[in-house]
């Protein structure tokens, strides 16, 4: 086999192997507390090593405008990622969260802010 063919096969194998290690979140749940101005983010993100496989970046958007970028350096739980983000949103606003894994892969979720309950 020529050197070029060996090199191409090696690169393709390396790319295929690295794609197998990506571990994006498998689900994201969002809830917004309008009284507190707090967005609660909870994602299922299994991790084999909390310091190597974790949610490394969260981008938050309100009505398509990026309002927050948060960086993380480890995950605190082997199965879930959680965080609370302070932001202002009104009923009808669309909040989008995009989570990125340290090993590659991403997942996004949107929610529409509802009217606050009156307690009746």
Segments (PLM) and residue ranges:
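Surface-exposed, short loops/turns at beta-strand junctions within beta-sandwich domains
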Residues: 86-93, 101
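Short acidic/polar inter-strand loop motif in beta-rich domains
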Residues: 99-109
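Solvent-exposed serine/threonine-rich low-complexity stretches and specific carbohydrate-binding patches
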Residues: 65-76, 112-114
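Beta-strand signatures of extracellular beta-sandwich domains
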Residues: 57-61, 98
